[in-house]
């Protein structure tokens, strides 16, 4: 499913993302993955557990190629002595993997996967970031404002990409202030207020005005909080 998280400014969105992705250690409470408590001491721990995060800043290196950005920190080394001792990369294998993952998500309008990311449009960069997360995120993908600062056409393509990822069986946590997008693609909406979960609603049961009213405190939900 796609679970949206909507929050007002200063309600703890960034801290929540950092805790789930291993960037900060929670003071209390627990994180459960597949029903079991997990403890992340670094982003590497979260990634190893199958959690991938696409930050609003994308966390990409503009000067590096699409392939290099897909594998940043997870490069494939050549087999044998060249890889083990000389740390030579298996670039053909990396390029093949990158092409396959981009093609699976319909992103092969990008002709040269070795071109620098800085030459791509905003929507294409966002697509690469989502494809990278989908390639390595086996449990859940966290998307932080994926359509922010994009034009209408590029934003639409990213939404389609998110739905493609969902159709592959990968759960998505979508953090966004864009209510029309949230109500269009999400199955459930987690409403965060003053650092805590206020309620979880289904888009078909409430209006966008209701969601905003809950989020800002102008209105209190009648239903009890659903389980996460």
Locations of regions flagged by a protein language model:
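Glycine-rich phosphate-binding loops of nucleotide-dependent enzymes
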Residues: 1-228
């Amino acid at each position: 499913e796609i679970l949206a998280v909507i929050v007002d400014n200063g309600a703890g969105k960034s801290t929540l993302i950092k805790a789930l992705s291993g960037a900060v250690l929670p003071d209390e409470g627990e994180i459960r993955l597949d029903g079991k408590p997990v403890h992340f001491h670094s982003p590497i721990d979260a990634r190893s557990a199958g959690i991938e995060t696409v930050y609003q800043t994308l966390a990409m290196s503009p000067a590096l190629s699409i392939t290099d950005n897909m594998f940043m920190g997870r490069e494939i080394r050549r087999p044998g002595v060249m890889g083990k001792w000389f740390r030579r990369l298996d670039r053909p294998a990396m390029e093949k993997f990158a092409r396959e993952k981009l093609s699976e998500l319909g992103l092969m309008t990008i002709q040269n996967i070795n071109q620098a990311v800085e030459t791509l449009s905003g929507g294409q960069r966002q697509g690469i970031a989502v494809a990278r997360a989908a390639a390595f995120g086996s449990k859940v993908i966290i998307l932080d404002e994926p359509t922010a600062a994009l034009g209408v056409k590029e934003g639409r393509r990213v939404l389609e990409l998110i739905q493609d990822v969902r159709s592959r069986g990968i759960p998505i946590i979508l953090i966004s202030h864009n209510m029309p997008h949230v109500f269009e693609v999400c199955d459930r909406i987690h409403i965060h207020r003053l650092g805590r979960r206020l309620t979880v609603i289904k888009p078909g049961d409430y209006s966008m005005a209701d969601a905003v009213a809950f989020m800002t405190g102008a209105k209190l939900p009648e239903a009890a909080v659903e389980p996460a």
